[in-house]
Amino acid sequence: MAQEKKQRVNEEISAPEVRLVGEDGEPLGIVSLNAALNAAEEAGLDLVEIAPMAQPPVCRVMDFGKFKYQEQKKAHEARLKQKQVQIKEVKLRPATDENDYQIKLRNLKRFLEEGDKCKVTLRFRGREMAHQEFGLRQLERVKADLEEIGQVEQMPKMEGRQMIMVISPKKNR
């Protein structure tokens, strides 16, 4: 997990005077640390250092437990909203039949519509290596069929006995 920034609370604050902000966000001016601590204690709340680098440091009167809980909740919601982009792989062969090709194409379309990247792998066996143009033609066909919903991120290239192309979803949808 990420290192969370630690706010100093109550007696942990070391500055002789602070810029005090009330619990409703209203500025109460620059006061001594003791006066600020007394104001927080009278309200039954904590004195929390919000901006330690300011001159003088900005401190706010608030319920620190509630503040930490709200921060955790915000961080959790932000994590939930992030979309993990996954790379889905579809494997083809130079001699893939039409029906199989259509099924794989439908899967590729579904992956792209869900916002995932797709890695199209075309595997060569035996003597097929001598006729790589068939494989290239197959990948060009995939590229043409997915033109309206995807864009080629990595052009077809050979890696060992397979040709690989990466397609990502189009942004302007």
Swiss-Prot record:
GO molecular function annotation: ribosome binding; translation initiation factor activity
KW Mitochondrion (keyword) present: no
Residue ranges of coiled coil: none
Subcellular localization(s) per the UniProt record: Cytoplasm
Main location: cytoplasm
Family annotation (PROSITE patterns): IF3
One GO CC term, this protein: membrane
Gene3D superfamilies membership: Translation initiation factor 3 (IF-3), C-terminal domain, Translation initiation factor 3 (IF-3), N-terminal domain
Keywords: Cytoplasm, Initiation factor, Protein biosynthesis
Keyword Metal-binding on entry: no
Example GO biological process: ribosome disassembly
Family annotation (HAMAP family): IF_3
Family the entry assigns: Belongs to the IF-3 family.
PANTHER family: TRANSLATION INITIATION FACTOR IF-3 (PTHR10938), TRANSLATION INITIATION FACTOR IF-3, MITOCHONDRIAL (PTHR10938:SF0)
Job description of the protein: IF-3 binds to the 30S ribosomal subunit and shifts the equilibrium between 70S ribosomes and their 50S and 30S subunits in favor of the free subunits, thus enhancing the availability of 30S subunits on which protein synthesis initiation begins.
Subunit structure: Monomer.
Protein name: Translation initiation factor IF-3
UniProt organism field: Aromatoleum aromaticum (strain DSM 19018 / LMG 30748 / EbN1)
